[in-house]
């Protein structure tokens, strides 16, 4: 298609397109997603361990003319960006890249993160996705980022709101409160606060919200389960103690001495079998 430029996998050099307007030249650099292993072989004299090392090496190899306006299109996770449940990130932030590596660029158009946001400075920006892809994005307003490059150093950034046909939302309350809502075809996560499970809750809620996508409960039982799963000293407790806590959480009462003996005997048998 005319005007569409596609950059393939990194092959040692960053492709660029040179355009001109009334203010002079604009150089658009196309940097595909890279990993340390992707670029290491192209820079044998450099120590490339992290994603930051990889991007630094690539940026240092680019022959930028600082008299021109330079735009970088990049698909990396930049330190400080706020991710949602939809994106995959490396444990411990190993895939993070410092936004300061892009200081020579007049504008950096970032992809990968779904939430529209700037990082470090207004000219380093994720435009975000046009639609919401997980309920962690329910409170996120989507938009199109419009960037006007005027003379060198003069960048104007505006956001044009995107209003979806069906929004993605979360609502919370008792079952009777949820059923009293106005009918809507939005994509919903419904959180019920009733202490007892509602039979066929999803089918009933579909009468008001036909596009319900997820149903959860938030009550004393589920909160107790969350506390149990997150117990900080679980590693310091015996299997019998952990089982006892789980039993009490589920049954609302402690085990009897007879039940404890049965559990102890079963655990002993399991350990002896190993």
Model-derived features: where do they sit?
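Accessory, non-catalytic peripheral segments of nucleic-acid enzymes
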Residues: 148-274
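Short, acidic/turn-prone active-site loops that include or flank metal/cofactor-
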Residues: 10-12, 130-132, 217-221
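Binuclear metal-dependent phosphoesterase catalytic core
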Residues: 14-26, 31, 124-187
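Short, structured coil segments at secondary-structure junctions
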Residues: 2, 104, 120, 208-211
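Conserved beta-sheet core of the metallophosphoesterase superfamily
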Residues: 6, 79, 84-155
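Conserved catalytic scaffold of divalent metal-dependent phosphoesterases
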Residues: 2-93
């Amino acid at each position: 298609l005319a005007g569409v430029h596609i950059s393939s996998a990194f092959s040692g050099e960053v492709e660029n397109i040179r355009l001109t307007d009334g203010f002079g030249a604009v150089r658009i650099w196309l940097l595909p997603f890279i990993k340390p292993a992707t670029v290491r072989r192209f820079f044998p004299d450099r120590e490339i361990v992290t994603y930051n090392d990889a991007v630094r090496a690539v940026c240092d190899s680019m022959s930028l003319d600082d008299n021109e306006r330079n735009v970088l299109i990049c698909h990396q996770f930049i330190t400080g960006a706020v991710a949602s449940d939809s994106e995959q990130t490396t444990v411990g932030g190993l895939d993070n890249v410092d936004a300061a590596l892009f200081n020579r660029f007049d504008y950096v158009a970032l992809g990968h993160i779904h939430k529209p946001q700037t990082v470090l400075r207004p000219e380093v920006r994720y435009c975000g996705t046009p639609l919401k892809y997980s309920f962690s994005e329910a409170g996120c307003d989507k938009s199109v980022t419009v960037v006007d490059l005027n003379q060198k150093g003069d960048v104007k950034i505006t956001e044009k709101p995107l209003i979806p046909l069906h929004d993605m939302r979360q609502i919370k309350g008792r079952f009777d409160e949820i059923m009293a809502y106005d009918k809507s075809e939005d994509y919903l996560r419904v959180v019920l606060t009733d202490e007892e499970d509602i039979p066929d809750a999803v089918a009933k809620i579909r009468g008001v919200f036909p596009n319900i996508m997820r149903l959860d409960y938030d009550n004393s039982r589920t909160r107790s389960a969350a506390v149990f799963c997150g117990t900080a000293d679980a590693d310091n407790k015996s299997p019998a103690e952990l089982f006892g806590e789980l039993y009490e959480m589920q049954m609302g009462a402690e085990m009897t001495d007879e039940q404890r003996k049965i559990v102890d005997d079963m655990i002993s048998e399991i350990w002896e079998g190993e």
